Structures are given as C-alpha cells and as structure tokens.
Amino acid sequence: MDLHEPLNMTMLCDFYELTMGNGYFAHNLKDRITYFDVFFRQVPDGGGVAIAAGLEQVIDYINNLHFSEADIAYLRSRKLFSEEFLEYLRTFRFTGDIWAVPEGTPVFPREPLMTVRAPAIEAQLIETYVLLQINHQSLIATKANRVCRAAAGRTVLEFGSRRAQGSDGAIVGARAAFIGGCAGTACTISDQLYGVPAGGTMAHSWVQMFDSEYEAFKAYCETYPTNATLLVDTYDSLHSGVPNAIRAFNEVLRPQGITKCGIRFDSGDIAYLTKKARKMLDDAGWPECKITVSNSLDERLINGLLDQGAQIDAFGVGERLITAKSEPVFGGVYKLCAIEREDGTIVPKIKISENVGKITNPHYKRVYRFFGRDTGMAEADYITVYDEVVDDTQPLEICDPDATWKKKVMTNFVAKELQVPIFLGGKQVYTSPTLPEIKQYCKEQIATLWPEVLRFDNPHNYYVDLSYKLLGIKMDLLNKGHS
C-alpha cells in the first residue's frame, strides 16, 4: 500500500463488520433488509441536552463508499473471505435509505439520531464510520454549546488544535465547536476546508523575540493595526504587560484614529487581573479595548470567573473543549431494531440486557418533538412505530417508558418530525445547509428549551416517551425473552 495515497475510508471499519458480511453472504442474507438506529444513552457531563453533529462527513463517506483493488487484495491475504464475497465487494455501493436529525439539533438519550434501512451487509459495513463521526462531532458540539452558554453572550474561540487527539480531532473538532456556538477557531485548515473563521494574534515567543516587551507590542501594532490583540502576561501582567500595551496603543493606534484593540491573559489569577486591567485601560482612554482570556478553561471555570466579576470580553478555550476532557466519550451506539421479510413485513428486534438502560427500543420508528402552540417551547419528544399517525389537533397522553405510571396529557401542541430523509435508494436527497446555517439553527433550537433543561447542575429530565403501541411491542418482546 502506498502510504502517500489518501486513505480509503471504506476500510475504516471494525474487522468484524467484514467477517459478519462474509457470513451473511455465505448464508444468503446479503439482501435481507435491516433497520439500524443510532442513539446514545447518556448526555455527557451530566447535562440535560446534547447537540447532534457529524452528518455532513457521513454523507461524504456514503457517497464515496467503494473497495479498491488494493483493499480486495488485502482482504484476500487474510484468507478468511470467500472469492464470491470479494467479488461482491469489488462492485460494492450503498443502495439503502438513511434518515437523520439535521446537524445542530438538540437531542436526548435513547431517541434515534439516525435510522439506516439497507441490505444487511451494507448496513453493517457503515457502522464504524457512522459512529466515529457522529460520536466525535456530537461530543465536541455538545461541549462547545455548554461552554458558550456559560460565557453568556461573550465570544468563545476554539483554541485547542495542538492538544487535540490527532489531526482529524483538531480539524473536524473545530467544525463541531463552531456548530455548538464558538465564533471561530485557531485551526487554519478548518477555515480552509469548512469555512470556520480562523484567527489569532501572538504567542509568548513573539514577545521574547524582541529586546523589550514594548518593542514587541509596538511592532505588532505597526504590522496589524486593525487586529492588535497583545499577549500581556509574558513577564509581569500588571506592571509591564498592560502598561506597555497601553503605550503601544497610544503611540501607534491612536494617531491613526484606531480605537478597537485588545489584550489577552493566558495565566495568573484571571479574575483579579482582568478587573485591574479593565480599570487601567479605561483610565488610559481605551474603553473599547477588549480583554480575552485563555488558560485551560471550561464551562465551570468560566461560570466561576463571571461569578467573581471578572472583566472578560472573549474566551479562548482549548484542550478542555477540543478533547471534551471532563467526559471524552459520547457513547453513541448502532443497534439493529428490525428486519424486513421478503413479503415486506417488518419484524421488530430488541436487545435485552440486565442493565435496563441498555435495553433497546425495537422496530422501525419515527421521532417527533412537541412544541407548545402558544409558547414555541419544546415540551417532549415522542417515539412511535413508523406507521402511526400523530394528530396534534387532539389531546395525546404520553407516559414514561421506564415508569409507565408517570403520565402527561399533551394539549395545544405542534408536532414536528425530527428525522429527515438523507439517502433514498442509495441516492442523496438531502441538500446540506451551510455551516453558518447549521450554527444558527442550533442556536434557534436551543432557545426552544426551558432553562431547567439547560442548567448544568441537576437538569430537568426532558420527556422522551414511547407511544403506547411501541411500548406494547417492546414489552411483548421483553416478555418473550428473545429477539
């Protein structure tokens, strides 16, 4: 294999997807239509809501699925796969259907983010890559959204490339962070590839390159007069950094009539330093000078800084965002929920576990979000069997699937189906929105959630309920004890 050639992502799959595929082929199951759901069981960080992301990369992957001759040769060398199966892979393409929630959608545990209907081998082979993208980007988008909500309207920039877990973690991580609410990134290639606004100013090395801190600041202001944000903590933040920044602003920017500028702190007692610096800047006639801070920040630390009255206009958030350090796994899974007989009958399937949280919801399903007709606020999500009709002109009783005595009657609501068709018959039917449109959609949808759902500590458990028909099918399968 030529390591300088681009990797074929079709081979980015768990090996057992291929061994199962070979087995399906051998037992005449390759054309059996299957239904798989992608869902997750728990919101990271004990939160009340997650953000779906990663769909665009899944679309690109599905559109380019194929096995190269080099792939076939490698698989043949393993001496596990029949020649008939390898010949099948030579012309392999995805021919199934995929429905998914749009990127930026707030989502909740155990509801389908994506549903795949496809022949068994096709549905099986895409599992790994689908989960890789949705898990990673949903994790980062969710973390970014928490950080941005903590910032309470202040600018948040993604600064984490150098601490990301690999190049892809940095590149698509910046994309996901933008969806979650970040204003931009330090990762240049994410701007080039996806249009995530890239920006940056200086490192401590810039300051150290000059004979004095003042000369470093003056040179930077001369080079970038309309984008002068100076890093003031290389030596002594309050006794040299801020005074030298003010001097450079006075001597270089003020004569040009430029009033917009900034300083950044990357260390020290941020709350104390920003309050002192704000007064120094204001007293020197620089009220428009923005203060940016960084230094291993996350939503909890940002909350704490603002509670202390820190004077901050923007946050640069790095390693704890791009790695989702506090809980670095999203936990999405890809589970069979139904198969289709030759006569078109759909047979529900269930995964049973002694761990109640790991019992799956069977059948080919639809998921709806109920919004208050008067308030526009999201009140509950409702999962039904695919052929059920939801009439939002009539009262509807819903119940907790784990505690069926907990019931709620929905009235005066509007039902919106969350999943939209992405592929039908192997052809893409979905027009992807632009990245800024996805970000705006996320912002708008988060605004439909009550504060009780969004709070960081002990959030309200948002209702995700099953229809009585679906609940009955699930209980019947549980009682039978088989799938």
Describe the residue ranges of each PLM region.
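N-terminal, Lys/Arg-enriched amphipathic/low-complexity engagement segments
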Residues: 34-90
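Residue-level "edge-of-site" marker
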Residues: 204, 294, 318
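Short, positively charged
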Residues: 78-86, 166, 394-402
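Buried, small/hydrophobic-residue-enriched core segments of structured protein domains
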Residues: 1-35, 42-44, 80, 86-95, ...
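Short coil/turn segments at secondary-structure boundaries
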Residues: 73-74, 142-146, 160, 454-461
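Hydrophobic residues within beta-strands of alpha/beta enzymes
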Residues: 199, 263, 291, 313-315
